[in-house]
Amino acid sequence: MRLGILLVLAMFLVSTACAEDLGNPVTGEAKTAFLTAWGERLRGMRSLHMVFTQEKHLRLLRQALVAQGELWLKGETLLYVLTNTAGEKELTVRLDKQTVKTYYPLLNTLEVIDLQTTRTLPQSLAFWQADPEALARDYEVDLFQAAGLHTLHLVPKDAKVPLQEMRIVLRDFHPQELVQIEKSGTRILMHITTFTINPEISEAQLDLHVPAGTKVTHPLK
């Protein structure tokens, strides 16, 4: 489970781009070499700190919902926080080998997903794979290059998942944008401003603090 992280994210432009909008296609040995090199970078990642701005576009709203995000990853434990424009924490997600816990402070609710039972990560958390073969197993993968940027275009092979497509824009293997488009029409765009590999992260930084009296739900049970 190489944190499929990130992000829980997810992320994406106001309209689905055609292949020609993403740059020149990279195929064959060049594509394999890029994916292999990216996998090697991920295998060497022991920890990660990321700061980003997220725009969430919903069909029923004219304006995007904007939030600031911060993510910490150490080993196989991840903590992800979103704060709205009023400075209020909207959600905190903690993921480890056993569970995904999502705390909504404004709703006084904690959602718990038992990974030992479901045996799979949510789609939005499982897109980063250290193994290119694993990536190709779960997604149709296309790679494009333009102006020093590489864009991975991912389409889930499982037609039952809510995700329609995902795009990851990288410069020198560092993500610049993450884009997710769901079949419901929801689009999320994540602009990454800080992406630091292997920083020092303490166990305390990965704690999820939930007040007593918080409502606990298990949405997949």
PLM regions: where:
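Gly/Pro-enriched, hydrophobic low-complexity segments
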Residues: 111-113, 134-220
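N-terminal leader/targeting segments and the immediate start of mature chains
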Residues: 18-64, 210-221
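Bacterial N-terminal signal peptides
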Residues: 6-14
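Positively charged n-region of N-terminal signal peptides that target proteins for export
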Residues: 1-4
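Buried hydrophobic packing residues in well-ordered domains
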Residues: 38, 50, 80-81, 100, ...
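An acidic-aromatic
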Residues: 70-123, 188
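Envelope-exposed proteins and targeting segments
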Residues: 46-48, 67-69, 76, 89-91, ...
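Anionic-ligand binding region
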Residues: 125-130, 137-138
